[in-house]
Each structure stands twice: as C-alpha cells, then as structure tokens.
Regions:
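Substrate-binding/catalytic cleft of secreted carbohydrate-active enzymes
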Residues: 2-171
Length: 171
C-alpha cells in the first residue's frame, strides 16, 4: 500500500484518493539530476528543489497519505552532502512524515541521514547481476544488511515490460 512518484509530485486528486483508501504516498521533487545537472554543486537546481519541496509540503502536507518524501531520483554531484542537509532540515521542521534524500539504484552511495532508504537490489532484482527469481533470501540480501536497522524500500522493482495479448480480453 505504498506508491512512489518517480521524480514528481502528483496532483491533489491523488492525495485525496490515497487518503480515502489508505495508500501511503512518496512524492518526490521534480528531479533526476544525473542527466545534465547535479546536486550540491551550486547549480540553479539546488535552490529550485528547496523551493519546490516547500511548495509540495505547503500544498499537500496535511494529507495523511503524504507520509514519505524524497527530493528526486538518482542524483550525481555532491549529492550525499546536499540530501543530508535536506533530510536534516525536514526532520527538524516537519515531523509529519519520514524523509529520505533520494531514491537510488544499487550502485549509489548510502545516505546516512535518511530515515528510510529507497534503493535497488531487493528480492534478487539486481538487474545486471542476476535474473529475477523466486529463490532469493530477502534476509540475506547484501543491500538489506548494509541498511542496518533503517527501513528499506525496494527501488523500481515494478519496472518490467508487459506485453498484453489483446485477443485474450473480452470484446
């Protein structure tokens, strides 16, 4: 019952619907700053994301479904220091939700200030290292073990191609 919004914040209707049915939402700042930009290097995106986070919380912060927050997806640059400041700020200024700096793949650094981690590699879904399978031991996963006691949310595990057979549906 958790839904992550990859690099964006959904509209009011998503929060209202999630409040009604009991979904937990993780909106993110509109950022995937490893394609032409980066965090923590003094670029305009640094200030933009701070302001956008403030706008998100002001607009939707009272929705009970808005219980998790990240600033974006897979950053580069001096991002660990930048997202650590982001998490520290929000932990101090708004305790209504839990915070992680950014949602990241398995090769990205750990974010020491995050209250939970969104990281790839859970359940044997390590993309290039092994094929998806049902024999993975979740409790023996190297990423889970590295997270320690901090909660761990699997990153992008639902990104699998699906090719429907349209002749199977009723007309």
């Amino acid at each position: 019952n958790h839904m992550r919004f990859h690099s964006f914040c959904p509209p009011e209707a998503a929060f209202a619907a999630a409040d009604r049915v009991g979904f937990y939402l993780q909106p993110e700042g509109p950022s995937w700053p490893n394609h032409g930009s980066s965090l923590g290097n003094g670029e305009p995106i640094d200030d933009y994301l701070w302001a956008e986070a403030e706008r998100m919380v002001k607009a939707y912060g009272n929705h009970p479904s808005f219980c998790m927050m990240a600033i974006g997806n897979e950053p580069r640059g001096n991002w660990v220091e930048w997202v650590s400041k982001f998490v520290d700020y929000w932990k101090e200024h708004d305790t209504r939700r839990v915070y992680t700096g950014a949602s990241v793949g398995g090769g990205w650094q750990w974010q020491p200030k995050s209250q939970y981690h969104v990281k790839a590699g859970a359940r044997g879904l390590e993309w290039a290292r092994q094929q998806p399978n049902s024999m993975d031991d979740f409790s023996d996963n190297r990423f889970i073990l590295q997270a320690g006691t901090t909660p761990y949310v699997s990153h992008e595990t639902g990104q699998w191609c699906g090719f429907p057979h349209f002749n199977e549906r009723r007309k």
